[in-house]
Regions:
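Outer-membrane beta-barrel transmembrane domain signature
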Residues: 21-64, 77, 92-97, 101-103, ...
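Outer-membrane beta-barrel "beta-signal"
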Residues: 153, 304-317
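Membrane-embedded beta-strand positions in outer-membrane beta-barrel channels/transporters
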Residues: 121-123, 150-152, 190-192, 262-264, ...
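Bacterial N-terminal signal peptides that target proteins for export
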Residues: 1-8
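N-terminal signal peptide c-region/cleavage motif recognized by signal peptidases
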Residues: 16-18
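Outer-envelope beta-barrel architecture signal
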Residues: 80-84, 130-132, 147-149, 163-167, ...
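Transmembrane beta-barrel domains of Gram-negative outer membranes and organellar outer membranes
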Residues: 21-160
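Transmembrane beta-strand segments that form the barrel wall of outer-membrane beta-barrel proteins
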Residues: 86, 128-143, 166-175, 275-284
């Protein structure tokens, strides 16, 4: 019996867990197949055809990039060359109504996405000489296997003057991790202004705000849009390339052609080493041109704004 128990324990340790997708994991093929035919030169209709699938992918990429970059949670002033900050953060983000009309975007999740979406994260910052600051943030998309990884570099153009506000520029790059079949990256410049007010002793209050311009880049691997495909239907001698039917990629989303603008405002409280903060953010995505792959017609589509509320709790050394 003891030998059996040891064997079972070893099996549990050695064997990997079964693959499982949670409700907020992305299934990108849910956006549909952009090709009206099964393959090049074929007249057979494609499976899961969506004439505006490329536009839906672009709209999704820009919206989810806005979700990934929805928080700043720090004023423009830097920590100083010896400073260090460690924070736990939480963003609550409102998702748009699913659909293809103006103000709608479909997030192709495995199940019904949670709305609002929660994005907890850990944020580490280190002060550098000459008013520079280096930071890193790792966040988790709630109810999914996906994470966000952010690297940032901030430079305070002006800070610490009695009668002048603090002004800073922040460069940042965020990448979605743990996703399947597609890549999503957001990179941009953030321009912030704020002013620290002493409340007595080591207690300060700093209101701040700014504008964040973020470019979005996204692409996909070769996708199989026929999710009911059986192996014996793709190995017939009559069509040795049947396995390539109903496969393809979405049109690439290019960084410099897809820029979101985000306005944010917040306040930070410091009492000794304790740091508290709250921030409201609104990301505006503007319009995109959507092409119909069946008719060749194009139309202008308004993307929804993404509203978020974020909080932070940490230690500032």
């Amino acid at each position: 019996m003891r030998t059996f128990s040891r064997g079972m324990a070893l099996a549990v340790l050695v064997c990997g867990s079964a693959a499982y997708a949670d409700r907020n994991d992305i299934k990108i093929t849910n956006l549909g197949n952009p090709s009206p035919v099964a393959s090049a030169g074929s007249t057979a209709p494609s499976v899961n055809f969506n004439a505006e699938a490329n536009g839906d992918f672009r709209a999704f990429a820009r919206t989810f990039a806005a979700v990934m970059t929805s928080a700043n949670l720090m004023p423009p002033e830097t920590l100083g060359h010896a400073g260090f900050s460690l924070n736990a953060e939480l963003s609550v983000i409102g998702l748009p109504t699913p659909g293809r009309e103006d103000g709608q975007v479909t997030i192709p999740t495995e199940g019904a996405p949670t709305n609002p979406l929660l994005l907890p994260s850990v944020h580490v910052r280190k002060g550098l000489p000459f008013s520079f600051e280096l930071g890193a943030r790792v966040g988790w998309i709630d109810r999914s296997d996906m994470f966000t990884a952010t690297g940032e570099l901030k430079w305070a153009v002006n800070e610490g003057f009695t009668w002048l506000p603090d002004i800073a520029v922040r460069a940042h790059v965020t990448r979605l991790m743990g996703n399947k079949d597609f890549d999503l990256t957001a990179a941009g410049l953030d321009f912030g202004v704020g002013k620290q007010f002493p409340l007595g002793g080591m207690v300060t209050l700093t209101p701040y705000g700014g504008l964040d311009l973020t470019g979005v880049a996204a692409s996909t691997d070769t996708l199989d849009f026929d999710q009911t495909r059986q192996r014996n239907t793709t190995t017939t001698p009559a069509n040795p390339y049947a396995g390539l039917d109903n496969t393809g990629v979405y049109q690439e989303v290019k960084l410099m052609e897809n820029v979101n603008s985000r306005l944010y405002g917040g306040v930070r409280f410091i009492g000794g080493a304790l740091q508290l903060g709250a921030e409201v953010s609104l990301s505006n995505q503007g319009f995109i041109e959507v092409a119909n792959t069946q008719t060749g017609a194009t139309r202008s589509r308004a993307l929804p704004a993404v509203l978020s509320f974020s909080t932070t709790l940490g230690l500032d050394f």
